[in-house]
C-alpha cells in the first residue's frame, strides 16, 4: 500500500514524523483529505484537528493554524502551536474561550479585538477537537 511522509512541526519542536495512508486537516477554505500522490498544494491551515491515519493507527493532533504544504509523497504542517490531541487540557480551553468572549464583549479601547477573535476561534477549535476525540473513543 502506498504511503505519504508526514511532518507536523510547531514553533518549538517537531511533534510528529512518520508515514500515513491518509491525512485530514482543516485548510483555510475547508476540509482537506490528503492521500499519497495528491496534487501539490500550499494553503493556510485553520485552527483545528489534524488526523494522521495509517493501517495500524490513527493519531489526532491540534494545530492552532499555520500552513500545510502537500507534495505527492510528503505532507509538511507548520503551526505556531501543535500538540497531541490526547494531551489537550479541556479546563484550560474552556477558560481561554471564556476569557476571549469576555474580551470581545468588553468596551475598553485597549482591547485588541482581532487578537481576541483569533483567541476565541482557537479556543473553540481546541474544545471541538477534544469533543471529537471523546466521541470516537
Residue ranges of each PLM-predicted region?
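Acidic/glycine-rich phosphate/pyrophosphate-binding loops and surrounding catalytic core
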Residues: 83-137
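Compact, glycine-rich, soluble single-domain proteins
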Residues: 7-99
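N-terminal export/targeting signal detector
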Residues: 1-5
